[in-house]
UniProtKB/Swiss-Prot annotation:
A Pfam family of this chain: Fz
Record's comment describing the protein's domains: Lys-Thr-X-X-X-Trp motif interacts with the PDZ domain of Dvl (Disheveled) family members and is involved in the activation of the Wnt/beta-catenin signaling pathway. The FZ domain is involved in binding with Wnt ligands.
InterPro entries the UniProt entry points to: Frizzled/SFRP (IPR015526), Frizzled/Smoothened_7TM (IPR000539), Frizzled_dom (IPR020067), Frizzled_dom_sf (IPR036790), FZ3_CRD (IPR041769), GPCR_2-like_7TM (IPR017981)
Description of post-translational modifications: Ubiquitinated by ZNRF3, leading to its degradation by the proteasome.
UniProt topological domain (Cytoplasmic) ranges: 227-237, 310-328, 396-420, 499-666
Gene responsible for this protein: Fzd3
Tissue specificity statement from the Swiss-Prot or TrEMBL entry: Expressed in the cortex, diencephalon, rostral brainstem and little or no staining is seen in the striatum or cerebellum. Expressed in both hair cells and supporting cells in the utricle, saccule, cristae and the organ of Corti in the inner ear (at protein level). Highly expressed in the CNS. In skin, it is restricted to the epidermis and to the developing hair follicle.
Protein's UniProt name: Frizzled-3
Cysteine-cysteine disulfides: C28-C89, C36-C82, C73-C110, C99-C133, C103-C127
Subunit structure: Interacts with VANGL2.
């Protein structure tokens, strides 16, 4: 018997101390419950053994048992109830419970009467919970340890009870919810800080920004699909970066359409249940929104880090495009593997929370620890690594600009490329740093916001008000709007990188049902124009001006740079223009009706005339054209080819290629 009492007292002490662990004071107070007057003791403590934080709440819970007490169904029933609702107050840390035999007698003698009044026997009052003994309550040894109430103690003793979950916010224990470190509790919906009209404005604001970001990132991705070979390393990560934020903006847009149907649990007035925030993975729709949003948010940041890595490899060790592309598998494994691992960990820890402002589900909205370790820590790490590599690459490019003598045109291209990298990085880093700043501010002041909310709603929810509140504050809506704005706008800079004349030409070709044509196809198209003969009659010393079809910001490093190709084309233009145009005419000659070739159909290069203008030339013009072609084109071609030295085409690094092409694409 003694051993069982010791074991049970230890268990009860653990439970009781856990209940009042957040209370800064423990004191005895006079019993004010009408049902518990005229007992051998007159002091009690709160919260009691049934988790009633004050005597008023305990009195409300005892009301269903008044008929049984008034009808005196058992002389043990009233002492048994008071032992639970107003237990005897002894020195701190000593708690005693009624004996099991006392409970069994009260139950057997009053259970039928309780059934008549429709009052069920509470689960907290099951007799198997109490120690196996047969002694009255309170025991004589307990009466000797009764504490005296504090002199002049008021009826309602002010103590720090901590947060007590209201009945309206309680959740089924199987779901594993938690709010303000209280289990089986969830925050209220709509948001606990803002009014409905403020939430409505915020939701439409987030929806508008998500549409803008979705349009920009989708345009970037579709531009990539039109010409996949245009964007290669070191710039290929920009495309995956855009895809990630395209998915992020899509999830926010879906949240705007869903409102709070996924982020919040439905209310149940019949069970006194208010609408609460969704937590955990039991809600499949909320889980899917969380997985996509968190995964692509982290993946977008990792792809930005990989972009800085590829720029660093191209600028400092001068890696070529093919060398960087060989590491593509490692890049993809890191960019998708790290966010995937973090997402799986959060799913296993059941850290999903509904966002009743944006309508999506994320992590760290109410759990500060999850925010600190799964949002702030990764983002800060990505920023530090990315900025370090970015600065190293820019410093290397600037050293090249200063130390290596370059032509003025190449100097301007290099400066322009450095400015472009800097602007793109600033457009990404500034919004991301603002988001990180909002998260830090939120975690620093969240405790004050929660205390203010409890202070304002404690009487409405009938829960203890905060004890000795020294500071009260409510969050500003602009803080949350800024956080969502910067979290979405961070994906828009990708459109500035693909914006060029080349992009406009590709989209124009796409909408006209044409694909990009090669230079050979363009030359053949020129040969088929009806006024081509007139172009042959011009002065051969006049340089050929070709229309630009736009240039790409990408290409392979095995090709010559655009500047070198332009030099070769200019050197060959005088001799090669007549040669290519006249030689292409040879295949279009026709025989005359008597089976002979026309006089201008000799095999020699100098004696060929274009077919496209034959029908419009008179005999005089034909002979004059042939004479001028024979004399001028032959001499000019030989002179130009003999004077121009052989030009060698060299292979450049991927950074040189990007710099040169960048100068012509903007």
């Amino acid at each position: 018997m003694a051993v069982s009492w010791i074991v049970f007292d230890l268990w009860l002490l653990t439970v009781f101390l856990g209940q009042i662990g957040g209370h800064s004071l423990f004191s005895c107070e006079p019993i004010t419950l009408r049902m518990c007057q005229d007992l051998p003791y007159n002091t009690t403590f709160m919260p009691n053994l049934l988790n009633h934080y004050d005597q008023q709440t305990a009195a409300l819970a005892m009301e269903p048992f008044h008929p049984m007490v008034n009808l005196d169904c058992s002389r043990d029933f009233r002492p048994f109830l008071c032992a639970l609702y107003a237990p005897i107050c002894m020195e701190y840390g000593r708690v005693t419970l009624p004996c099991r035999r006392l409970c069994q007698r009260a139950y057997s003698e009053c259970s039928k009467l309780m059934e008549m009044f429709g009052v069920p026997w509470p689960e907290d009052m099951e007799c198997s919970r109490f120690p196996d003994c047969d002694e009255p309550y309170p025991r004589l040894v307990d009466l000797n340890l009764v504490g005296d109430p504090t002199e002049g103690a008021p009826v309602a003793v002010q103590r720090d009870y901590g947060f007590w979950c209201p009945r309206e916010l309680k959740i089924d224990p199987d779901l594993g919810y938690s709010f303000l470190h209280v289990r089986d509790c969830s925050p209220p919906c709509p948001n606990m800080y803002f009014r409905r009209e403020e939430l409505s404005f915020a939701r439409y604001f987030i929806g508008l920004i998500s549409i803008i970001c979705l349009s920009a990132t989708l345009f970037t991705f579709l531009t990539f699909l039109i010409d996949v070979t245009r964007f290669r390393y070191p710039e290929r990560p920009i495309i995956f970066y855009a895809v990630c934020y395209m998915m992020v903006s899509l999830i926010f847009f879906i949240g705007f359409l869903l409102e709070d149907r996924v982020a919040c649990n439905a209310s149940s007035p019949a069970q006194y249940k208010a609408s609460t925030v969704t937590q955990g993975s039991h809600n499949k729709a909320c889980t899917m929104l969380f997985m996509v949003l968190y995964f692509f948010t982290m993946a977008g940041s990792v792809w930005w880090v990989i972009l800085t890595i590829t720029w660093f490899l191209a600028a400092v060790p001068k890696w070529g495009s093919e060398a960087i592309e060989k590491k593509a598998l490692l890049f993809h494994a890191s960019a998708w593997g790290i966010p995937g691992t973090l997402t799986i960990i959060l799913l296993a820890m059941n850290k999903i929370e509904g966002d009743n402002i944006s309508g999506v589900c994320f992590v760290g909205l109410y759990d500060v620890d999850a925010l600190r370790y799964f949002v702030l820590a990764p983002l800060c790490l990505y920023v530090v690594v990315g900025v370090s590599l970015l600065l190293a690459g820019i410093i290397s490019l600037n050293r090249v600009r200063i130390e290596i003598p370059l032509e003025k045109e190449n100097q301007d291209k290099l400066v322009k490329f450095m400015i472009r990298i800097g602007v793109f990085s600033i457009l990404y880093l500034v919004p991301l740093l603002v988001v990180i700043g909002c998260y830090f501010y939120e975690q620093a002041y969240r405790g004050i916001w929660e205390t203010t909310w409890i202070q304002e709603r404690c009487r409405e929810y009938h829960i203890p008000c905060p004890y000795q509140v020294t500071q009260m504050s409510r969050p500003d809506l602009i803080l949350f709007l800024m956080k969502y704005l910067m979290a979405l706008i961070v994906g828009i800079p990708s459109i500035f990188w693909v914006g060029s004349k080349k992009t406009c030409f590709e989209w124009a070709s796409f909408f006209h049902g044409r694909r990009k044509k090669e230079i050979v196809n363009e030359s053949r198209q020129v040969l088929q124009e009806p006024d081509f003969a007139q172009s042959l009659l011009r002065d051969p010393n006049t340089p050929i001006i070709r229309k630009s079809r736009g240039t790409s910001t990408q290409g392979t490093s095995t090709h010559a740079s655009s500047t070198q190709l332009a030099m070769v084309d200019d050197q060959r233009s005088k001799a090669g223009s007549v040669h290519s145009k006249v030689s292409s005419y040879h295949g279009s000659l026709h025989r005359s009706r008597d089976g002979r070739y026309t006089p201008c159909s000799y095999r020699g290069m100098e004696e060929r005339l274009p077919h496209g203008s034959m029908s419009r030339l008179t005999d005089h013009s034909r002979h004059s054209s042939s004479h001028r072609l024979n004399e001028q084109s032959r001499h000019s071609s030989i002179r130009d080819l003999s004077n121009n030295p052989m030009t060698h085409i060299t292979h450049g690094t991927s950074m040189n290629r990007v710099i040169e092409e960048d100068g012509t694409s903007a």
